[in-house]
């Protein structure tokens, strides 16, 4: 009992009388400055402080705990000074070049010869440098080189819009075809161009330009062949809303080294449609019509231009007049006067033809002289009959 009473006489270290001393240990404005406030672990008493509390008394323990501890460098300043990550924009400011560059290896493209039948699924027009193909059909593209590129060379295919107002946009599939279950397990659903029959194809998205491309290793031609053939597929129609939306596109094929340096470049236009043969025939006819020279109207002319048929038709050449004279014996006065009038009409026509083009009517004196020579006696006078109901 004596030991228990002696224990009760000892003041507990964390009683209400010591709360004011603990409160004074807290820094000022602790609530309003969370950055400068120490962590919660520093506010709690450690095991050493508790032992000092019992051994040396509460006053000495509070003085030791109130001593400022060495502050560790806080990474708050470095965190605030770190720049925020840049925002990624959906459009690209750089446009890939579409100029032909054969390079030192003589890189060029080739296509199979095909007609314009309705049953054809892929056809190439040399005059337009344009490929017409159906959706998701095989499009063989031949790669020709004069000398073999070094090992590690790759072939990249990328689609861009042809017109300048659309070049900065990324060519991708429409939302409808993106949701279609036609993936081969390698190509992402938003990529337009795919490689058929090559498991080594890599589908890339550029981190800076966000453009889609497909890369395959370059393989030299097989024995007995002069070129390498890659089979491409176009997975969206040119007329799809939300995708190409009838905007013409170009496919750029580049030959790149193992370090990414450009070895060659070539391009061609592509139209993905339902009837490639019909569309190729129509566009070639329109191209030929546009290539024909059209006559230009004269300057400062307000009159309507004549059609091409009348302006382009060659005018007949004028035949030289015959200068010989012939004598014709005619029986009967009436016949003589009739042949005389016919001869005068022919003479008048020849006189008009000899004059300049600007003078379309003969001179009045010439008509008077011809009229005076006519001595026709069989002139009929026509009288107007007046009926009973006429006014």
UniProtKB/Swiss-Prot annotation:
Q: Using the record's annotations, give every residue carrying the modification N6-methyllysine.
A: 368, 370, 380
Region annotation Required for interaction with ZNF385A: where it falls in the sequence? 98-298
**Ranges where the record places region Disordered:** 65-87, 281-323, 348-391
Stretch list, region Interaction with E4F1: 254-292
Sorted alphabetically, the Gene Ontology BP terms of this entry are: cellular senescence; circadian behavior; DNA damage response; entrainment of circadian clock by photoperiod; negative regulation of cell growth; negative regulation of DNA-templated transcription; nucleotide-excision repair; oligodendrocyte apoptotic process
The note describing how and how many cofactors are bound reads: Binds 1 zinc ion per subunit.
DNA-binding region at which residues? Answer: 100-290
Region listing for Interaction with WWOX, in residue ranges: 64-108
Family of the protein in this entry: Belongs to the p53 family.
Q: What is this protein called?
A: Cellular tumor antigen p53
The protein's organism comes out as Marmota monax
Gene name for this UniProt entry: TP53
């Amino acid at each position: 009992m004596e030991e228990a009473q002696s224990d009760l006489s000892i003041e507990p270290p964390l009683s209400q009388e010591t709360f004011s001393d603990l409160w004074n240990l807290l820094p000022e404005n602790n609530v309003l400055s969370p950055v400068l406030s120490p962590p919660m672990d520093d506010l709690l008493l450690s095991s050493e402080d508790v032992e000092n509390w019992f051994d040396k008394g509460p006053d000495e323990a509070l003085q030791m705990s109130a001593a400022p501890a060495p502050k560790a460098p806080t990474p708050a300043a470095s965190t605030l000074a770190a720049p925020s990550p840049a925002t990624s924009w959906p459009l690209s400011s750089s446009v890939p070049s579409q100029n032909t560059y054969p390079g030192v290896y003589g890189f060029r493209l080739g296509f199979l010869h095909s007609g314009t039948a309705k049953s054809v699924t892929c056809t190439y027009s040399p005059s337009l440098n344009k490929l017409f193909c159906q959706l998701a059909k095989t499009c063989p593209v031949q790669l020709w080189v004069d000398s073999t590129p070094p090992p590690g060379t790759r072939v990249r295919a990328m689609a861009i819009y042809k017109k300048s107002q659309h070049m900065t946009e990324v060519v991708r599939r429409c939302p409808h075809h993106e949701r279609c279950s036609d993936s081969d397990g390698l190509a992402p659903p938003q990529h337009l161009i795919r490689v058929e029959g090559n498991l080594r194809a890599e589908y890339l998205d550029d981190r800076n330009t966000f453009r889609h491309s497909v890369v395959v290793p370059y393989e030299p031609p097989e024995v007995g062949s002069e070129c390498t053939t890659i089979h491409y597929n176009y997975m969206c129609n040119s007329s799809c809303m939300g995708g190409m939306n009838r905007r013409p596109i170009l496919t750029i094929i580049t030959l790149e080294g193992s370090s990414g340096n450009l070895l060659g470049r070539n391009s061609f236009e592509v139209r993905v449609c339902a009837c490639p043969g019909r569309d190729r025939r129509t566009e070639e006819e329109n191209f030929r019509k546009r290539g024909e020279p059209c006559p230009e109207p004269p300057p400062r002319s307000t009159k309507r231009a004549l059609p091409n048929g009348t302006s382009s038709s060659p005018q007949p050449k004028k035949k030289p007049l015959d200068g010989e004279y012939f004598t014709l014996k005619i029986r009967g006065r009436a016949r003589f006067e009739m042949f005389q009038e016919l001869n005068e009409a022919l003479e008048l026509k020849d006189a008009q033809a000899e004059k300049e083009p600007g003078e379309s009517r003969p001179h009045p004196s010439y008509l008077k002289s011809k009229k005076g020579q006519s001595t026709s006696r069989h002139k009929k006078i026509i009288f107007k009959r007046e009926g009973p109901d006429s006014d």
